[in-house]
UniProtKB/Swiss-Prot annotation:
Subcellular localization(s) per the UniProt record: Cytoplasm
Keywords on record: Cytoplasm, Elongation factor, Protein biosynthesis
Main location: cytoplasm
Protein name per its UniProtKB record: Elongation factor Ts
Assigned GO CC terms: cytoplasm
Family (UniProt): Belongs to the EF-Ts family.
Entry function: Associates with the EF-Tu.GDP complex and induces the exchange of GDP to GTP. It remains bound to the aminoacyl-tRNA.EF-Tu.GTP complex up to the GTP hydrolysis stage on the ribosome.
InterPro entries documented for this protein: EF-Ts_dimer_sf, Transl_elong_EFTs/EF1B, Transl_elong_EFTs/EF1B_dimer, Transl_elong_Ts_CS, UBA-like_sf
Gene behind the chain: tsf
Region annotation Involved in Mg(2+) ion dislocation from EF-Tu: where it falls in the sequence: 79-82
GO MF entries: translation elongation factor activity
Mitochondrion among keywords: no
Transmembrane helix in keyword set: no
Length: 283
């Protein structure tokens, strides 16, 4: 039975699959549209399972306010092209809406959207992963997104503009803690041991080495804490000094960046082509 272009078009619109996949599915079912859809759904799930081994290190960070809190969500894909795709973003925003409605756990979000995720993987041909969801409580909240890849929410006692600027600062400067005294004792101890060893290797007298370590530790805790950093809007002041002048306070922040901690697989072009050829021979 000859398959018409109209049939292929209809199947593409109903499944979102590629033209050649649609044509092949219709040929295998002698033009039976519903059977072709069923078969593609089955094979799509199989394709999704194969894609699960691929590294999803691209994607988007989304932010939404709930009742007295905000939610930050990271959903990953494999390429920046898919990260801008309407189907991918629609899926990510659907997950975000559910999270913002009632602080749903990551495990429950994954379970609730697994069927939709598998269907999306089959449709776009990339691994998709709902990777992280973070909630931050506060009555005064300000958020900032830098493109699609970085999202920040800051809460505290300050006007909206101040908190917004501080969220921009957090996006750019990547502090890990609010205040120097918030740096965990084990982090401080590890850095202090390192600085002592460095000072000893430099051959400094004990008294001078001790002062050097104190100074270096102050610099270390300042650089990784928000209030100890130089404020990007007024670099001659620390964020702490700026907040004191404003009579303001930051109580918490969360910063997420797409792909943090994911080791992205690097392949040269020749290897990539060879892999595609090998895959086509197996198909």
């Amino acid at each position: 039975m000859a398959i018409s272009a109209a049939q292929v078009k209809e199947l593409r619109e109903r499944t979102g699959a590629g033209m050649m996949d649609c044509k092949k599915a219709l040929e295998e079912t002698n033009g039976d549209m519903e059977l072709a859809i069923d078969n593609m759904r089955k094979s799509g799930a199989a394709k999704a399972a194969k894609k699960a081994g691929n590294i999803a290190a691209d994607g988007t960070i989304l932010i939404k306010n709930g009742e007295g809190f905000a939610v930050l969500l990271e959903v990953n894909c494999q390429t920046d092209f898919v990260a801008k795709d309407a189907n991918f973003l629609g899926f990510a925003n659907a997950v975000l809406d559910v999270a913002a409605a009632s602080k749903v756990s990551l495990e429950d979000l994954k379970a609730q959207f697994e069927e939709a995720r598998v269907a999306l993987v089959a449709k776009i041909g990339e691994n998709i992963n709902v990777r992280r969801v973070e909630y931050i409580d506060g009555t005064q909240l300000a958020s900032y997104r830098h493109g699609e890849r970085i999202g920040v929410v800051v809460t505290g006692e300050a006007d909206e503009e101040t908190l917004k600027h501080l969220a921009m600062h957090v996006a750019a400067s990547k502090p890990e803690y609010v205040n120097p005294e918030d740096v965990p004792a084990d982090v401080v101890a590890r850095e202090q041991a390192l600085q002592i060893e460095i000072s000893m290797n430099e051959g400094k007298p004990a008294e001078i080495a001790e002062k050097m370590v104190v100074g270096r530790m102050k610099k270390f805790t300042g650089e990784i804490s928000l209030t100890g950093q130089a404020y990007i809007m007024e670099p001659k002041k620390t964020v702490g000094e700026f907040l004191k002048e404003k009579g303001a306070k930051v109580t918490n922040f969360i910063r997420l960046e797409v792909g943090e901690g994911i080791e992205k697989k690097e392949e040269d072009f020749a290897a990539e082509v060879a892999a595609q050829i090998a895959a086509s021979k197996k198909a």
